[in-house]
Amino acid sequence: GMENILKFLDNSSFKNNINFHDYSIDSKVYPERKRDIFGFWNDFTWQIKLKYKIDVVLGLISGVDKGSVYGKSFNAKGIGIKSNIIFYLKQNGRLQTEVAFINVVEENNFGILPPEVLKGYAYGQSLKTNSRLQYLLNQSLSFNLNLNTINDMRYKNMITLQGEVRAYF
C-alpha cells in the first residue's frame, strides 16, 4: 500500500491511502469454495481540527476487486463516502462516530460476493456506523461503550452494543 499526507493550512490535511491486494483462499473442508481475489482499495480523506477540541474527517472511499469463486469470475466495484467526527471531552474522554455509505456493483450478476471483496461491503447499498465513547471517571475507573450498526443486503438494520468498565489497580 501507499499513503500520502498533504498538510493544508494549520489545522487540516488531505490523506490518500491506497492498498493493493492479491488473495488466494483455499478451503480444506469444501474445495469448491476456493477463491482468488485481486484489486485495490482507495481511501481519500480531508481532516480538519476545529476549535473546542473537535476533529472532523470527510472522505471518498472506492475500490475494485476481480477474481473467481465457485469457478465463476466476478468484477466488483464500490464507491462511497465516509465521515468521522471526534469530540474530546475535556481531558477525560472522547466520543467518536464514523459513518460510511457505499454502493457496490458487480458486472457478472453475482448475488453474493466473498467477504474479502471490497473490505467486506455487501453487494448493493451499505450503510455502516460505528460510535465509541471512552471516558476516564477517575484515576482508577473508566468505561468504554461501542455502538455499531449495519444496514445492507446481508444484515438488515443490525445493531450491536458493547460496553465495559475497567478498574486500574
Predicted feature locations:
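Exposed, low-structure sequence patches enriched in small/polar residues
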Residues: 1-169
